[in-house]
Structures are given as structure tokens and as C-alpha cells.
């Protein structure tokens, strides 16, 4: 495999010395870029881009042509696993993802099997291999999956939800059924991420988008314990390097200590927690990723720069162990020039912290 020309992102995740704070953006390959919209229009729909290795590679690399990002992230969707389990994923305009056959009872859970990542999810592995080849060692490639809890919310609700009543009904009325599903999903995520690593992903991330809707007790029982199982089951060395693992629970700021105790290398932060506070609590154990509010990219350029400066100074001296990112995905109507200024500001303003 090609030697990495820029491994700053991987080194920061492992709390090794770096010359500046690395940066990438959640959803950096996406609708805010006109070149992405063009590919998507020609492909017909979102999953057609995901399932074509050349198109997935093209959109993964598009933001790297514009910006000096320190990592590429596989262009895919968190719902590939439930789709491969036969739930019938489809997208309604303006409605987001939906499933034709949601999970409603134990019989539904018994029917689904752990997908073979090189068979039903082979298109994802083909995309990983294609992207790695195309990157030519410029920057590392991040693989990812949804967390078992977050995948289960879509599978049981049948799509997005505001109140999560269907999954919470199962959680409180039939907890053993939900645990059975979450356990199958954890096994699926382990095999899926390990296949991505074998195909060339140099770091992996688990997105627990909906963990923050749970009480502390339920978060530990229904979300975190399954992410801990995943961390335990992952390949942590490949191609002569450590493969860092990042866990990200949106609205999970109150549980940082528990997340850090899973054995992950890094914890993702959203903007609802102060990075200085997060570092004081868990910075000795894990690296931190985040955490600018993505809506800050609507602000005038000097305001964006001011926010970057505030977050960098919040993380402070002894600057390794921080990967700069947004606290969630970049919004589709953001001006790409604002994203570019954000990235340039992180690189320029972070250098004094790494002398």
C-alpha cells in the first residue's frame, strides 16, 4: 500500500505530536458542492451514487480538490446495513430515508441475518478500494457505520422520527426483543467495519446520531454497551499502522467519561458542549473531534475565524489530540467559500499551539 503523505489526522487521533490541528467536515462530500449536485442529478438518486464505486469515489474526492482537508471520508450512508438486511430502503423527496418493511416484533428480528460485507455490502468495499487507489496516499480514508441504537431507530420507526415512540415502546414493553436486534446490529457493524478496514479504511467512526434521545440509564443499556462491543471487536492494526476508532453520540456531552471508557481512541463532540470542559474531563484518555456549530458557516468570514480561534484556545496548549470538525454535518445551502475559509483558518490559527 502507498505510504501516507499526510498522516496528521491519524496522529492527532492517537494523541501523537502534530504540526497543526487537522480538520475535516462531516458530510464534506455533499449537496453544498455544485459538483456533487451534478453527479447526483446524473446518477438519478442518492443510493445510485453509493452503489457505483466510481461515482462514490468521485464524490468522496471532490471536496479534496477544493480544500486542503486532512482526511477523506467514504461516501456512503449509515443505512446500508439495514438495507442489506432486506428492509427495503427508499428515499422520499423532502422526507428522508424510509423502509418498506420496518421491524415490528420478535419474528421480524428473528428473520434478519448479519449481512456478508463482501456480498450484500460488496459495493461499499469496492468503493473503499477504489477511493484508496485514487487517493494515492495523499490523506487517510475514514470508514464509518451507524451505531446499533441509531440503526434500530430507523428500522423500527420505518424512517426518521421526532418522538421515537415505536422504538421506545419496544424498549420498555419488550426490551429483550430490542436487545436481540441491537446484538445482531453490533455483530453486523463489527463485520462491516472490519471489512472496510481490510479494504483500505485507515480509521473508522461510529455515528450514534440518536443516542442523545435516551436517559442516562437507557443510553448505557441500549446504546453505549453495544458501541463498546463494537470497539472490542474491531481490527485495530492494519498495514503496519494503528486504526483509530472514533465514537460520536450527538447530544452525548453528559456521557463523555462513559464513552471514553469503551477503549475508543477519540470521542466526537457536538457544539452543545464546551471543548475546554470536554478536555478537562476526558482529554487524558482520548482524543477529541469537533466541535463548531455547522450553522456558524453561514456567518461572515471574520466571525467564522473568531469561532475557530475560540475553539482552538479552548482546547489549548499541548495541542495534540484534537481533530477539528463541525459538531454535525455541513448544511446543504452553505457557501463553499465559507467552508474553505473555515479549513484555512484552522490550519493557520492552530500552528502556534503545536510549537
Swiss-Prot record:
Pathway assigned to this chain's UniProt record: Porphyrin-containing compound metabolism; protoporphyrin-IX biosynthesis; coproporphyrinogen-III from 5-aminolevulinate: step 4/4
One cellular component term from this protein's GO annotations in UniProt: cytosol
Cited function: Catalyzes the decarboxylation of four acetate groups of uroporphyrinogen-III to yield coproporphyrinogen-III.
UniProt family annotation: Belongs to the uroporphyrinogen decarboxylase family.
Reaction equations catalysed: uroporphyrinogen III + 4 H(+) = coproporphyrinogen III + 4 CO2
Name of this chain's protein: Uroporphyrinogen decarboxylase
Gene3D superfamilies noted in UniProt: 3.20.20.210
Example of a GO biological process term: protoporphyrinogen IX biosynthetic process from glutamate
Main location: cytoplasm
Site (Transition state stabilizer): 77
Entry keywords, A to Z: Cytoplasm, Decarboxylase, Lyase, Porphyrin biosynthesis
Location(s), subcellular: Cytoplasm
Subunit structure: Homodimer.
Chain sites annotated for binding substrate: 27-31, 77, 154, 209, 328
Pfam family, one: URO-D
PROSITE patterns: UROD_1, UROD_2
Natural source organism: Colwellia psychrerythraea (strain 34H / ATCC BAA-681) (Vibrio psychroerythus)
Transmembrane segments: none
Gene from which the chain derives: hemE
E.C. code: 4.1.1.37
InterPro entries: UROD/MetE-like_sf (IPR038071), Uroporphyrinogen_deCO2ase_HemE (IPR006361), Uroporphyrinogen_deCOase (IPR000257)
GO molecular function: uroporphyrinogen decarboxylase activity
Amino acid at each position: 500500500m502507498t505510504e501516507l503523505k499526510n498522516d496528521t489526522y491519524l496522529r492527532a487521533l492517537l494523541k501523537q505530536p502534530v504540526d497543526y490541528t487537522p480538520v475535516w467536515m462531516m458530510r464534506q462530500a455533499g449537496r453544498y458542492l455544485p459538483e456533487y449536485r451534478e453527479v447526483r442529478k446524473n446518477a438519478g438518486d442518492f443510493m445510485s451514487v453509493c452503489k457505483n464505486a466510481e461515482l462514490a469515489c468521485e464524490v468522496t474526492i471532490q471536496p479534496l480538490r477544493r480544500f486542503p482537508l486532512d482526511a477523506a471520508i467514504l461516501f456512503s450512508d449509515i443505512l446500508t446495513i439495514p438495507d442489506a438486511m432486506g428492509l427495503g430502503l427508499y428515499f422520499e423527496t423532502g422526507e428522508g430515508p424510509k423502509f418498506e418493511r420496518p421491524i415490528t416484533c420478535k419474528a421480524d428480528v428473528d428473520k434478519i441475518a448479519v449481512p456478508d460485507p463482501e456480498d450484500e455490502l460488496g459495493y461499499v468495499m469496492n468503493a473503499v478500494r477504489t477511493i484508496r487507489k485514487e487517493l494515492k496516499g495523499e490523506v487517510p480514508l475514514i470508514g464509518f457505520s451507524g451505531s446499533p441504537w441509531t440503526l434500530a431507530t430507523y428500522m423500527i420507526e420505518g424512517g426518521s422520527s421526532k418522538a421515537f415512540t415505536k422504538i421506545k415502546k419496544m424498549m420498555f414493553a419488550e426490551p429483550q426483543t430490542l436487545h436481540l436486534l441491537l446484538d445482531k446490529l453490533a455483530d453486523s457493524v463489527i463485520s462491516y467495519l472490519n471489512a472496510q478496514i481490510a479494504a483500505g479504511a485507515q480509521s473508522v467512526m461510529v455515528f450514534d446520531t440518536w443516542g442523545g434521545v435516551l436517559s442516562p440509564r437507557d443510553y448505557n443499556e441500549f446504546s453505549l454497551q453495544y458501541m463498546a462491543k463494537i470497539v472490542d471487536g474491531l481490527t485495530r492494526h492494519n498495514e503496519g499502522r494503528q486504526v483509530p476508532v472514533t465514537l460520536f453520540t450527538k447530544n452525548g456531552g453528559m456521557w463523555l467519561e462513559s464513552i471514553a471508557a469503551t477503549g475508543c481512541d477519540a470521542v466526537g463532540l457536538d457544539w452543545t458542549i464546551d471543548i475546554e470542559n470536554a478536555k478537562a474531563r476526558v482529554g487524558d484518555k482520548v482524543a477529541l473531534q469537533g466541535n463548531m456549530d455547522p450553522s456558524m458557516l453561514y456567518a461572515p468570514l471574520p466571525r467564522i475565524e473568531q469561532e475557530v480561534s475560540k475553539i482552538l484556545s479552548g482546547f489549548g496548549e499541548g495541542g495534540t489530540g484534537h481533530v477539528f470538525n463541525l459538531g454535525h454535518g455541513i448544511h446543504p445551502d452553505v457557501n463553499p467559500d465559507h467552508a474553505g475559509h473555515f479549513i484555512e483558518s484552522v490550519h493557520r490559527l492552530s500552528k502556534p499551539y503545536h510549537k
